């Protein structure tokens, strides 16, 4: 019998993307409730408890409520895509390539917290350097990023695509998170192995899907002898054997005139780059991904597959 999967919040942006990725699969059975019944708590609870894996695509408070609905049922495993549990030590963090053991931890877990889109890029760049001893304690990390507007859900999609919307956004690019308290900072800090919270400056561009995350570094303030080449080598070693996360060769990066934010639109992979001038004292680390792919729905399906294979 095929394992039963219930997407709680299947009619939202992330939920719809997960359904699209699972369309046509015969190895799982998708449970579903009509959109008109999506707020029917009794029906949701029945579906949640009838699933082998429940994928929660809900706001934080609603996710916490859903977890309570299945807390006594050890037969139900949960993947949550909100920020509610990402730094909870009782939950496996769903970035399978984060370190060599993480995929196994996800596979064995009952509760998996799907990473945020921005943290996937930031942690993907930062954690290997912390693990390798290149990035010292106390280093003042800055993370700058731009996302496609689908990351803001249905409300922002309407604001960006409908010029008649009462709160229409006409700017081709805008900065937000201005008080520097974005909800993704805690998971960047914890899973990036940082002892000091980064300064995170997110922004949104007038494109639907895609993301660029940048982490600029001063080599003089890193471990003695660190070069652009040694940073690149550390990333290559960390992701050796991985298919979903790849490190672009330095020669290929050097030849690029630009990085296109929508290059990986519709894909569930992530590319990492190291930019700079050999012998200079600065580098810029860049992660490229689809905010709805490896940054959300693609990661959720990847985590589901790891859990089903265990």
UniProtKB/Swiss-Prot annotation:
It is found in: Cytoplasm. It comes from Rhizobium johnstonii (strain DSM 114642 / LMG 32736 / 3841) (Rhizobium leguminosarum bv. viciae). It catalyses: N-acetyl-L-glutamate 5-semialdehyde + phosphate + NADP(+) = N-acetyl-L-glutamyl 5-phosphate + NADPH + H(+). Pathway: Amino-acid biosynthesis; L-arginine biosynthesis; N(2)-acetyl-L-ornithine from L-glutamate: step 3/4. NCBIfam families: argC_other. Belongs to the NAGSA dehydrogenase family. Type 2 subfamily. The active site is at residue 117. GO terms for cellular component: cytoplasm. GO terms for biological process: L-arginine biosynthetic process. The keyword Cytoplasm applies. One of its GO terms (molecular function) is N-acetyl-gamma-glutamyl-phosphate reductase activity. Transmembrane segments: none annotated. Its EC number is 1.2.1.38. This is N-acetyl-gamma-glutamyl-phosphate reductase. Catalyzes the NADPH-dependent reduction of N-acetyl-5-glutamyl phosphate to yield N-acetyl-L-glutamate 5-semialdehyde. Keywords: Amino-acid biosynthesis, Arginine biosynthesis, Cytoplasm, NADP, Oxidoreductase. InterPro entries: AGPR_AS, AGPR_type-2, NAD(P)-bd_dom_sf, NAGSA_dehydrogenase, Semialdehyde_DH_NAD-bd.
